[in-house]
Protein backbone atom coordinates (compact mmCIF):
# COMPACT_ATOMS: atom_id res chain seq x y z
CA UNK A 1 0.00 0.00 0.00
CA UNK A 2 1.10 3.53 -0.72
CA UNK A 3 0.89 6.36 1.81
CA UNK A 4 -2.40 8.24 1.69
CA UNK A 5 -0.84 11.38 0.20
CA UNK A 6 0.69 9.41 -2.68
CA UNK A 7 -2.62 7.71 -3.35
CA UNK A 8 -4.27 11.14 -3.40
CA UNK A 9 -1.74 12.45 -5.93
CA UNK A 10 -2.28 9.42 -8.15
CA UNK A 11 -6.04 9.87 -7.83
CA UNK A 12 -5.80 13.51 -8.91
CA UNK A 13 -3.53 12.58 -11.83
CA UNK A 14 -6.02 9.96 -13.06
CA UNK A 15 -8.89 12.45 -12.84
CA UNK A 16 -6.95 15.11 -14.79
CA UNK A 17 -5.97 12.58 -17.46
CA UNK A 18 -9.59 11.47 -17.79
CA UNK A 19 -11.01 15.00 -18.01
CA UNK A 20 -8.44 16.19 -20.55
CA UNK A 21 -8.03 13.04 -22.61
CA UNK A 22 -11.66 12.02 -23.12
CA UNK A 23 -13.01 15.13 -24.90
CA UNK A 24 -9.86 15.54 -27.01
CA UNK A 25 -9.92 11.92 -28.16
CA UNK A 26 -13.65 12.07 -28.88
CA UNK A 27 -13.05 15.08 -31.14
CA UNK A 28 -10.22 13.21 -32.86
CA UNK A 29 -12.41 10.11 -33.23
CA UNK A 30 -15.11 12.12 -34.99
CA UNK A 31 -12.54 13.68 -37.32
CA UNK A 32 -10.87 10.39 -38.22
CA UNK A 33 -14.16 8.55 -38.76
CA UNK A 34 -15.19 11.29 -41.18
CA UNK A 35 -11.88 10.97 -43.01
CA UNK A 36 -12.05 7.16 -43.16
CA UNK A 37 -15.50 7.34 -44.77
CA UNK A 38 -14.06 9.25 -47.71
CA UNK A 39 -12.79 7.31 -50.76
CA UNK A 40 -9.31 5.84 -50.47
CA UNK A 41 -8.31 6.92 -46.95
CA UNK A 42 -4.59 7.03 -46.28
CA UNK A 43 -3.12 4.21 -44.17
CA UNK A 44 -1.91 6.78 -41.64
CA UNK A 45 -5.48 7.84 -40.88
CA UNK A 46 -6.43 4.23 -40.21
CA UNK A 47 -3.50 3.96 -37.80
CA UNK A 48 -4.40 7.26 -36.15
CA UNK A 49 -8.02 6.10 -35.78
CA UNK A 50 -6.80 2.88 -34.15
CA UNK A 51 -4.58 4.88 -31.79
CA UNK A 52 -7.59 7.00 -30.85
CA UNK A 53 -9.61 3.87 -30.11
CA UNK A 54 -6.77 2.52 -27.95
CA UNK A 55 -6.73 5.78 -26.00
CA UNK A 56 -10.51 5.71 -25.56
CA UNK A 57 -10.35 2.13 -24.30
CA UNK A 58 -7.84 3.21 -21.67
CA UNK A 59 -9.91 6.26 -20.74
CA UNK A 60 -13.13 4.25 -20.42
CA UNK A 61 -11.37 1.88 -18.01
CA UNK A 62 -9.72 4.71 -16.10
CA UNK A 63 -12.72 5.18 -13.72
CA UNK A 64 -11.93 1.74 -12.27
CA UNK A 65 -8.34 2.86 -11.66
CA UNK A 66 -9.74 6.02 -10.07
CA UNK A 67 -11.86 3.91 -7.71
CA UNK A 68 -8.81 1.80 -6.89
CA UNK A 69 -6.67 4.86 -6.13
CA UNK A 70 -9.46 6.38 -4.03
CA UNK A 71 -9.48 3.16 -1.97
CA UNK A 72 -5.70 3.39 -1.40
CA UNK A 73 -5.17 0.59 -3.93
CA UNK A 74 -7.47 -1.86 -2.18
CA UNK A 75 -9.74 -3.68 -4.59
CA UNK A 76 -13.37 -3.93 -3.44
CA UNK A 77 -14.92 -4.66 -6.83
CA UNK A 78 -15.52 -8.20 -8.13
CA UNK A 79 -12.45 -10.14 -9.14
CA UNK A 80 -13.62 -10.46 -12.73
CA UNK A 81 -13.76 -6.67 -12.99
CA UNK A 82 -10.10 -6.53 -11.99
CA UNK A 83 -9.23 -9.10 -14.66
CA UNK A 84 -11.11 -7.30 -17.43
CA UNK A 85 -9.87 -3.87 -16.38
CA UNK A 86 -6.24 -4.98 -16.27
CA UNK A 87 -6.54 -6.81 -19.58
CA UNK A 88 -8.05 -3.87 -21.44
CA UNK A 89 -5.95 -1.22 -19.70
CA UNK A 90 -2.55 -2.77 -20.39
CA UNK A 91 -3.54 -4.01 -23.85
CA UNK A 92 -4.35 -0.44 -24.87
CA UNK A 93 -0.95 0.74 -23.63
CA UNK A 94 1.01 -1.85 -25.59
CA UNK A 95 -1.18 -1.49 -28.66
CA UNK A 96 -0.25 2.20 -28.71
CA UNK A 97 3.49 1.50 -28.93
CA UNK A 98 3.29 -0.42 -32.19
CA UNK A 99 0.66 1.94 -33.62
CA UNK A 100 3.06 4.82 -32.96
CA UNK A 101 5.79 2.83 -34.68
CA UNK A 102 3.50 2.20 -37.66
CA UNK A 103 2.71 5.90 -37.94
CA UNK A 104 6.42 6.73 -37.88
CA UNK A 105 7.10 4.21 -40.66
CA UNK A 106 4.33 5.70 -42.78
CA UNK A 107 5.62 9.23 -42.26
CA UNK A 108 9.18 8.24 -43.14
CA UNK A 109 8.16 6.40 -46.31
CA UNK A 110 5.97 9.32 -47.35
CA UNK A 111 8.86 11.80 -47.42
CA UNK A 112 11.76 9.47 -48.28
CA UNK A 113 10.02 7.75 -51.21
CA UNK A 114 7.15 10.09 -52.11
CA UNK A 115 6.43 8.80 -55.62
CA UNK A 116 6.57 5.11 -54.72
CA UNK A 117 4.56 5.81 -51.59
CA UNK A 118 1.73 7.53 -53.46
CA UNK A 119 1.58 4.77 -56.06
CA UNK A 120 1.62 1.84 -53.65
CA UNK A 121 -0.28 2.98 -50.56
CA UNK A 122 -3.55 1.15 -49.93
CA UNK A 123 -6.07 1.44 -47.06
CA UNK A 124 -5.69 -2.31 -46.60
CA UNK A 125 -2.10 -1.82 -45.45
CA UNK A 126 -3.26 0.43 -42.62
CA UNK A 127 -5.94 -2.08 -41.61
CA UNK A 128 -3.43 -4.94 -41.54
CA UNK A 129 -0.91 -2.92 -39.52
CA UNK A 130 -3.58 -1.90 -37.00
CA UNK A 131 -4.83 -5.48 -36.65
CA UNK A 132 -1.29 -6.73 -36.05
CA UNK A 133 -0.82 -4.16 -33.28
CA UNK A 134 -4.11 -5.10 -31.61
CA UNK A 135 -3.49 -8.86 -31.88
CA UNK A 136 0.05 -8.56 -30.49
CA UNK A 137 -1.06 -6.46 -27.52
CA UNK A 138 -4.17 -8.50 -26.70
CA UNK A 139 -2.28 -11.77 -27.15
CA UNK A 140 0.57 -10.82 -24.83
CA UNK A 141 -1.65 -9.32 -22.14
CA UNK A 142 -3.98 -12.32 -22.26
CA UNK A 143 -1.05 -14.47 -21.16
CA UNK A 144 -0.43 -12.31 -18.11
CA UNK A 145 -4.10 -12.23 -17.09
CA UNK A 146 -4.50 -15.99 -17.48
CA UNK A 147 -1.41 -16.58 -15.37
CA UNK A 148 -2.63 -14.33 -12.61
CA UNK A 149 -6.22 -15.49 -12.37
CA UNK A 150 -6.27 -19.10 -13.53
CA UNK A 151 -2.88 -20.54 -12.59
CA UNK A 152 -3.47 -20.60 -8.86
CA UNK A 153 -6.14 -21.43 -6.33
CA UNK A 154 -4.58 -19.16 -3.74
CA UNK A 155 -6.12 -15.72 -3.28
CA UNK A 156 -3.33 -13.18 -3.09
CA UNK A 157 -3.82 -10.53 -0.44
CA UNK A 158 -1.90 -7.59 0.94
CA UNK A 159 -2.40 -7.89 4.67
CA UNK A 160 -6.13 -8.38 5.06
CA UNK A 161 -7.01 -6.49 1.89
CA UNK A 162 -7.35 -7.75 -1.67
CA UNK A 163 -5.37 -5.91 -4.34
CA UNK A 164 -5.68 -5.94 -8.12
CA UNK A 165 -2.70 -6.97 -10.22
CA UNK A 166 -0.25 -5.99 -7.50
CA UNK A 167 0.74 -9.12 -5.55
CA UNK A 168 1.59 -12.56 -6.88
CA UNK A 169 2.42 -15.96 -5.47
CA UNK A 170 5.89 -17.40 -6.08
CA UNK A 171 4.47 -19.74 -8.71
CA UNK A 172 2.86 -16.84 -10.51
CA UNK A 173 6.07 -14.80 -10.38
CA UNK A 174 7.94 -17.63 -12.10
CA UNK A 175 5.78 -16.99 -15.17
CA UNK A 176 4.76 -13.34 -14.81
CA UNK A 177 8.26 -11.88 -14.54
CA UNK A 178 9.64 -13.49 -17.73
CA UNK A 179 6.47 -12.54 -19.59
CA UNK A 180 6.80 -8.93 -18.43
CA UNK A 181 10.41 -8.93 -19.61
CA UNK A 182 9.28 -10.18 -23.02
CA UNK A 183 6.58 -7.49 -23.08
CA UNK A 184 9.22 -4.88 -22.41
CA UNK A 185 11.46 -6.08 -25.23
CA UNK A 186 8.90 -6.87 -27.94
CA UNK A 187 6.24 -4.24 -27.25
CA UNK A 188 8.40 -1.36 -26.06
CA UNK A 189 12.08 -1.38 -26.98
CA UNK A 190 11.64 -2.70 -30.54
CA UNK A 191 8.86 -0.26 -31.53
CA UNK A 192 10.73 2.58 -29.82
CA UNK A 193 13.88 1.80 -31.82
CA UNK A 194 11.86 1.70 -35.05
CA UNK A 195 10.15 4.98 -34.17
CA UNK A 196 13.39 6.79 -33.30
CA UNK A 197 15.02 5.74 -36.57
CA UNK A 198 12.01 6.67 -38.71
CA UNK A 199 11.46 10.08 -37.13
CA UNK A 200 15.19 10.87 -37.18
CA UNK A 201 15.18 10.31 -40.94
CA UNK A 202 11.79 11.99 -41.34
CA UNK A 203 12.83 15.19 -39.57
CA UNK A 204 16.21 15.28 -41.32
CA UNK A 205 14.54 15.04 -44.74
CA UNK A 206 11.91 17.66 -43.87
CA UNK A 207 14.51 20.12 -42.60
CA UNK A 208 16.83 19.57 -45.57
CA UNK A 209 14.17 20.10 -48.25
CA UNK A 210 14.33 23.75 -49.43
CA UNK A 211 10.76 23.67 -50.76
CA UNK A 212 9.24 22.64 -47.42
CA UNK A 213 7.65 25.58 -45.63
CA UNK A 214 8.46 26.65 -42.10
CA UNK A 215 5.02 25.64 -40.81
CA UNK A 216 5.34 22.08 -42.12
CA UNK A 217 8.84 21.85 -40.65
CA UNK A 218 7.55 22.91 -37.24
CA UNK A 219 4.77 20.34 -37.43
CA UNK A 220 7.29 17.65 -38.37
CA UNK A 221 9.51 18.49 -35.41
CA UNK A 222 6.48 18.72 -33.11
CA UNK A 223 5.24 15.32 -34.26
CA UNK A 224 8.62 13.72 -33.58
CA UNK A 225 9.00 15.39 -30.18
CA UNK A 226 5.52 14.41 -28.97
CA UNK A 227 6.04 10.81 -30.07
CA UNK A 228 9.43 10.63 -28.37
CA UNK A 229 7.91 12.05 -25.17
CA UNK A 230 5.25 9.36 -25.38
CA UNK A 231 7.85 6.62 -25.36
CA UNK A 232 10.28 8.09 -22.85
CA UNK A 233 7.95 9.80 -20.37
CA UNK A 234 4.74 7.77 -20.66
CA UNK A 235 5.81 4.24 -21.53
CA UNK A 236 9.43 4.32 -20.34
CA UNK A 237 9.00 4.20 -16.53
CA UNK A 238 6.44 1.39 -16.66
CA UNK A 239 8.64 -0.80 -18.85
CA UNK A 240 11.71 -0.04 -16.76
CA UNK A 241 9.70 -1.39 -13.81
CA UNK A 242 9.54 -4.71 -15.69
CA UNK A 243 13.34 -4.81 -15.89
CA UNK A 244 13.71 -3.90 -12.22
CA UNK A 245 11.03 -6.41 -11.21
CA UNK A 246 12.71 -9.19 -13.17
CA UNK A 247 16.02 -8.43 -11.45
CA UNK A 248 14.54 -8.12 -7.94
CA UNK A 249 11.91 -10.84 -8.44
CA UNK A 250 9.17 -8.52 -7.27
CA UNK A 251 7.32 -5.45 -8.48
CA UNK A 252 9.08 -2.20 -7.45
CA UNK A 253 7.18 0.02 -5.03
CA UNK A 254 6.94 2.80 -7.62
CA UNK A 255 5.23 0.65 -10.24
CA UNK A 256 1.81 2.18 -9.53
CA UNK A 257 3.30 5.63 -10.19
CA UNK A 258 4.76 4.37 -13.47
CA UNK A 259 1.29 3.17 -14.48
CA UNK A 260 0.05 6.75 -14.08
CA UNK A 261 2.68 7.94 -16.54
CA UNK A 262 1.55 5.25 -18.99
CA UNK A 263 -2.00 6.57 -18.71
CA UNK A 264 -0.72 10.05 -19.56
CA UNK A 265 -0.32 9.02 -23.20
CA UNK A 266 -4.09 9.28 -23.61
CA UNK A 267 -3.79 13.03 -22.93
CA UNK A 268 -0.59 13.43 -24.94
CA UNK A 269 -1.76 11.65 -28.09
CA UNK A 270 -4.18 14.45 -29.09
CA UNK A 271 -1.11 16.65 -29.59
CA UNK A 272 0.24 14.00 -31.94
CA UNK A 273 -3.10 13.99 -33.78
CA UNK A 274 -2.92 17.78 -34.07
CA UNK A 275 0.53 17.71 -35.67
CA UNK A 276 -0.36 14.72 -37.87
CA UNK A 277 -3.63 15.60 -39.55
CA UNK A 278 -5.33 18.69 -40.91
CA UNK A 279 -8.76 17.16 -40.23
CA UNK A 280 -7.94 17.02 -36.52
CA UNK A 281 -6.65 20.59 -36.53
CA UNK A 282 -9.93 21.72 -38.05
CA UNK A 283 -11.92 19.62 -35.56
CA UNK A 284 -10.00 21.06 -32.61
CA UNK A 285 -10.45 24.54 -34.07
CA UNK A 286 -14.20 24.05 -34.29
CA UNK A 287 -14.29 22.67 -30.77
CA UNK A 288 -12.43 25.69 -29.42
CA UNK A 289 -14.75 27.93 -31.40
CA UNK A 290 -17.77 26.34 -29.73
CA UNK A 291 -16.23 27.02 -26.32
CA UNK A 292 -15.51 30.62 -27.31
CA UNK A 293 -19.07 31.07 -28.56
CA UNK A 294 -20.50 29.71 -25.32
CA UNK A 295 -18.27 31.99 -23.29
CA UNK A 296 -19.04 35.03 -25.41
CA UNK A 297 -22.78 34.36 -25.22
CA UNK A 298 -22.56 34.66 -21.46
CA UNK A 299 -20.83 38.00 -21.89
CA UNK A 300 -23.23 39.27 -24.52
CA UNK A 301 -20.68 39.24 -27.37
CA UNK A 302 -21.70 36.11 -29.20
CA UNK A 303 -22.43 37.64 -32.59
CA UNK A 304 -19.08 39.31 -33.16
CA UNK A 305 -16.94 36.40 -31.95
CA UNK A 306 -18.94 33.86 -33.96
CA UNK A 307 -18.38 35.77 -37.20
CA UNK A 308 -14.66 36.13 -36.55
CA UNK A 309 -14.27 32.48 -35.57
CA UNK A 310 -16.10 31.26 -38.69
CA UNK A 311 -13.80 33.24 -40.95
CA UNK A 312 -10.73 31.90 -39.13
CA UNK A 313 -11.96 28.32 -39.45
CA UNK A 314 -12.54 28.73 -43.18
CA UNK A 315 -9.05 30.13 -43.55
CA UNK A 316 -7.55 27.11 -41.85
CA UNK A 317 -9.51 24.76 -44.07
CA UNK A 318 -8.34 26.52 -47.24
CA UNK A 319 -4.71 26.77 -46.15
CA UNK A 320 -4.15 23.11 -45.42
CA UNK A 321 -2.61 20.69 -47.88
CA UNK A 322 -3.88 17.34 -49.03
CA UNK A 323 -5.83 15.69 -46.18
CA UNK A 324 -4.48 12.27 -47.07
CA UNK A 325 -0.96 13.03 -45.85
CA UNK A 326 0.22 16.41 -44.60
CA UNK A 327 3.90 15.56 -44.87
CA UNK A 328 4.13 13.71 -48.18
CA UNK A 329 6.32 15.68 -50.56
CA UNK A 330 4.81 16.43 -53.96
Curated annotation (Swiss-Prot):
SUPFAM superfamilies given in the database record: Family A G protein-coupled receptor-like (SSF81321)
Residue ranges that the UniProt entry lists as topological domain Cytoplasmic: 34-41, 106-126, 195-219, 277-330
Tissue expression remark: Expressed at relatively high levels in peripheral blood leukocytes and, to lesser extent, in spleen.
Transmembrane portions of the chain: 13-33, 42-62, 85-105, 127-147, 174-194, 220-240, 256-276
Region (Disordered): 299-330
Mutation effect (residue 165 to A): Partial loss of propionate-induced G protein-coupled receptor activity
Subcellular location: Cell membrane
Extracellular side: 1-12, 63-84, 148-173, 241-255
Effect after changing residue 90 to A: Partial loss of propionate-induced G protein-coupled receptor activity
Subunit structure: Interacts with FCN1 (via Fibrinogen C-terminal domain).
Name listed for the protein in its UniProt record: Free fatty acid receptor 2
Lineage: Eukaryota, Metazoa, Chordata, Craniata, Vertebrata
